[in-house]
A protein has these predicted regions:
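Conserved alpha/beta-domain cores
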Residues: 93-94, 517, 527-878
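C-terminal domain-closing interface element
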Residues: 334-336, 491-539, 545
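Glycine-rich phosphate/ribose-binding loops and adjacent secondary-structure elements
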Residues: 330-332, 429-440, 444-446, 452-458, ...
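Protease-associated
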Residues: 358-442, 504-509, 521, 525-528, ...
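Nucleotide/phosphate-binding sheet-loop regions of phosphoryl- and nucleotidyl-transfer enzymes
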Residues: 1-389, 422-425, 432-437, 443, ...
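Short beta->alpha connector loops at strand-helix junctions that form conserved
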Residues: 41, 448-450, 469-472, 560, ...
Length: 878
């Protein structure tokens, strides 16, 4: 049987999301629920994938099914494409299985041409509406399908408004719009070199191809990479009969949420515009009215809409984001989906749904996007500083948080300035999808136009970036890079602050303070902890970091990098003395100076962790990272050592390595300079003995981690030194403290010989940053130079340093665990690379049987939640 590439809305349902995309599946589900949905059909995601496999062509089989479904649609609607009596007009929209707001393109009013527009004008008795639809269609088709920029058409509209002495598009009459349509077609011909297509079927095929193509546009690729959406999924295309919101004052269009997407409050939240089409609300060109005002304008429609909102939320058991159109007092539902929301709102909604009996705790934990928790942990304005500040303006509080930075006016500049380390805020009339890179680089986004559902608001909420939109009192001069607000002119580079929770805007910088987390956050986290199996530790080198991580729920330290401690104060001088010493005695003398301060550091860490596990990694970086580069510092070192500057420079030169990442570092340092390992072991054990004495009820068991093993013999050599030193210290103190010696697995050979290495190591911890480097054979610091080309050419979908490569690096990890546990069944295994805080990597760690993940302090809640979600998913799949 031939593949089915096209489905009517009556043939699908919500479970077919992978095939029909989110929008298509939900249109089918709303149809099944008996809601007023303009009918149509969905071309599947598989057809999109096939389109790319066929060299960006729609093959005959798929084309045949599309044409069959056009005929079926004509039968259902009683209208015909290109007909002089009763013409069918459609919208063409994309819809991937994961919601990608603003990433994919829409075309409305398709099916119009010179003849059809005249029929519509005459039949409806509303020529203004007919020509408004036509000029919009030409503009959208030109922009989305043929890539003739919107700006050319906007300029023609502005010119026409100027000639007519009007301010708003809605003030142009039928003749003006008819003239604009002609000007648009002339513009199209000039840019494309051929006439605007008049055959509705040709228009439709070109539009479908454009939606498929937009799956691969640069902004879709960026969004996919940021949100772990595979390229192979493809997008579906929805072809739907038009419902017209621009037929006059009894028509309109809007977007609404069943709960507030910024705060989570249980109240209908949304906006509508009378005499407008769907894109007008989202594009933010005119600032819309609040949904509550629909009650005054059209009470019956409002009541019907509220009822539908309840139906949909009860059905999907989640907050819904809906698009609707009113055509001459008749309500049509164009879309519903689980709404994008801020992290704050997500927690509140999840807890409220549990309290309302709609969902259970496991479902509540599963519906929070772990990465979004980041935003809750970000600073807010300091209340005292805020009291002294006077707002100079106010907009809509579109996405919470506090932003201070230098003003930039374009996305490109935002990225360029941010790359040099500057904090910037992006100020725009309105944002569009191509601004995504600049939006990511900004501390916050401020727009003059647009409402709570504009592109800027939706994308900023998704990214966890502060946003204030609809600041209509700004007088903008983008060309000269300045604007006026509150009686003051602001130029590029000036500093402003704004609050995405209140919408207030301030002149200058305002002090921020650490985020406060409690309430719903605590509830969700306690539920998450009930379900997860993986322990979550933190990477911390200071008591301050350790304390913060404990507050955020860390159950230990998975990685304490001891080298960071050597850079503090005058310790670096002693360490440099050690490096430049000629004899073992001289080195030991220098290390004796470091021992008490290193011991003191460890004592503070043990205190901060209150008896929870602490893994201390011995010295890892190559020695050249510690030597001075400034002339004055070199002279100071020469003086201390009683050597000449030339001798010190010769020592520094001798430390130079061609490939330091694979050079004299890690346990290789301990092999050549065992006295370093001796000093560090003494510091670890003495600190543990002292803290254990002070807190006899704590179960303190230091974990000593030897970095960069590649062979069991080198590990045994270093471990023997550690054990001999530790046992002597414990005996001398008359203590009974226990300790463990393990290793960091970060070289592929260690994974391949893990059965041997486990004879010496009591635990493994995967250092996935280096393991990724060594497995791929590229350096983390240089990979950025070519990774973008790899994304563009579809060789890689993600940065393997941000998201664990499960196929290669993951296979090595799995092998190491299996081999290691054969030798030592009680072996405990963790991960402490940056991947420890990446949700998809945490899920993989759960699957392959790790005992813990360790990540930076602020990612601890993300890892806790991701670990719980992995356990719940496994439970649900059984």
């Amino acid at each position: 049987m031939a593949n089915k590439w096209v489905y009517l809305f009556t043939e699908g349902n919500a479970t077919m999301r992978n095939l029909l995309g989110g929008k298509g599946a939900n249109l089918a589900e709303m149809t099944n629920l008996g809601l007023p949905v303009p009918q149509g059909f969905t071309i599947t995601t598989e057809a999109c994938t096939q389109y790319y496999e066929d060299g960006e062509k729609i093959n005959d089989e798929i084309m045949g099914q599309i044409m069959d479904h056009i005929n079926k649609m004509e039968e259902i609607t009683g209208k015909k494409f290109g007909d002089k009596e009763n013409p069918l007009l459609v919208s063409v929209r994309s819809g991937a299985r994961a919601s990608m707001p603003g990433m994919m393109d829409t075309i409305l009013n398709l099916g119009l041409n010179e003849e059809v527009v005249e029929v519509l004008a005459e039949k409806s008795g509303n020529p203004r509406w007919a020509y408004d639809c036509y000029r919009r269609f030409i503009q959208m088709f030109s922009d989305v399908v043929m890539e003739v920029g919107k700006k050319y058409f906007e300029a023609l509209i502005d010119k026409m408004k100027e000639q007519k002495g009007v301010k708003q598009d809605v003030e142009l009459d039928a003749n003006d719009l008819k003239e604009l349509a002609n000007q648009f077609k002339a513009e199209y011909k000039e840019k494309i070199g051929k006439d605007f297509p008049s055959d509705p079927k040709e228009q439709l095929v070109e539009a479908i191809k454009a939606v498929f193509r937009s799956w691969d546009n640069p902004r879709a690729n960026v969004y996919r990479r940021d949100n772990d959406i595979p390229y192979s999924w493809g997008t579906a295309v929805n072809v739907q009969m038009m419902a017209f919101g621009n037929m006059g004052d009894t028509s309109g269009t809007g977007v609404a949420f069943t709960r507030d997407p910024a705060t989570g409050e249980k109240k209908l939240m949304g906006e509508f515009l009378m005499n407008a089409q769907g894109e007008d609300v989202v594009a933010g060109v005119r600032t819309p009215q609040h949904i509550d005002q629909l009650k005054q304008v059209m009470p019956e429609v409002y009541d019907q809409f509220v009822k539908i909102c309840h139906t949909l939320e009860d059905h999907y058991r989640d907050m819904q984001d809906m698009e609707f159109t009113i055509e001459d007092r008749k309500l049509y539902m164009l879309q519903t989906r689980n709404g994008k929301r801020t992290a704050f709102a997500a927690l509140k909604i999840a807890c409220d749904l549990v309290d309302e009996g709609m969902i259970d705790e496991a479902k509540a934990v599963s519906m929070i996007e772990p990465r979004n928790l980041d935003t809750l942990l970000h600073p807010t304005f300091d209340p005292e500083a805020l009291k002294k500040a006077t707002p100079i303006g106010k907009g809509l509080a579109a996405s919470p948080g506090a932003a201070s930075g230098q003003i930039v006016f374009t996305a490109e500049e935002a990225k360029e300035w941010a790359d040099t380390g500057k904090k910037v805020v992006l100020v725009r009339l309105e944002t569009s999808p191509e601004d995504i890179e600049g939006m990511k680089a900004s501390q916050g986004i401020l727009t003059v136009r647009g409402g709570m559902t504009s592109h800027a608001a939706v994308v900023a909420r998704g990214m966890g970036t502060c946003c204030v939109s609809g600041v209509s009192e700004i007088v903008m001069d983008e060309e000269n890079k300045k604007f006026e607000l509150g009686g003051k002119i602001f130029h590029e580079g000036d500093v402003i602050s704004f609050d995405g929770t209140t919408g207030n805007i301030y002149d200058g910088a305002i002090a921020t303070r650490e985020a406060q987390i409690a309430g719903e956050f605590g509830r969700i986290m306690s539920w998450a902890d009930k379900y997860r199996r993986l322990k979550v530790r933190t990477n911390a080198d200071t008591p301050h970091d350790a304390k913060k991580a404990r507050e955020l729920g860390a159950e230990g330290i998975g990685l304490c990098r001891t080298e960071h401690m050597f850079f503090e104060g005058d310790r670096i001088d002693a360490f440099r003395e050690m490096i430049c010493s000629d004899t073992v005695e001289e080195r030991e003398k220098a290390l004796e100076k470091i021992l008490p301060v290193q011991q003191g550091d460890f004592e503070k860490l043990y205190e901060a962790l209150e008896g929870n596990p602490v893994t201390i990694r011995f010295l890892d970086p190559p020695l050249h990272e510690f030597v001075p580069t400034e002339e004055a510092e070199i002279e100071k070192l020469a003086h201390t050592q009683g050597k000449s500057v030339a001798q010190i420079k010769a020592i520094i030169a001798s430390l130079h390595e061609f490939n330091p990442m694979m050079g004299h570092r890690g346990l290789r340092l301990a092999v050549t300079y065992p006295e370093i390992a001796v000093m560090q072991t003494k510091a670890v054990i003495r600190a543990a003995i002292n803290v254990a004495k002070a807190h006899p009820d704590w179960n303190l068991k230091p974990e000593i981690m030897i970095p960069l093993s590649s062979d069991s013999k080198e590990l045994k050599y270093v471990k023997d030194i550690v054990v001999k030193t530790a046992d002597a210290e414990i005996a001398a103190a008359g203590s009974n403290i226990k300790y463990e010696v393990g290793t960091m697995i970060e070289i592929p050979r260690a994974c391949l010989t893990a059965d041997d290495i486990a004879k010496e190591a009591e635990f493994f911890c995967f250092g996935t940053n280096d393991l990724t480097q060594m497995t791929f054979g590229f350096s983390r610091d240089d990979a950025g130079k070519f990774l973008n080309a790899y994304y563009d050419k579809k060789i890689f979908e993600n940065d393997p340093f941000a998201k664990l490569d499960q196929v290669g690096v993951g296979k090595l990890m799995k092998m190491a665990i299996e081999l290691g546990k054969k030798t030592r069944p009680e072996l405990h295994v963790g991960i402490c690379g940056e991947h420890g805080g990446d949700p998809s990597s945490v899920e993989f760690c759960h699957k392959i049987g790790l005992d813990y993940v360790s990540c930076s302090p602020f990612r601890v809640p993300i890892a806790r939640l991701a670990a719980a979600q992995a356990a719940i998913a496994e439970m649900n799949n059984k």
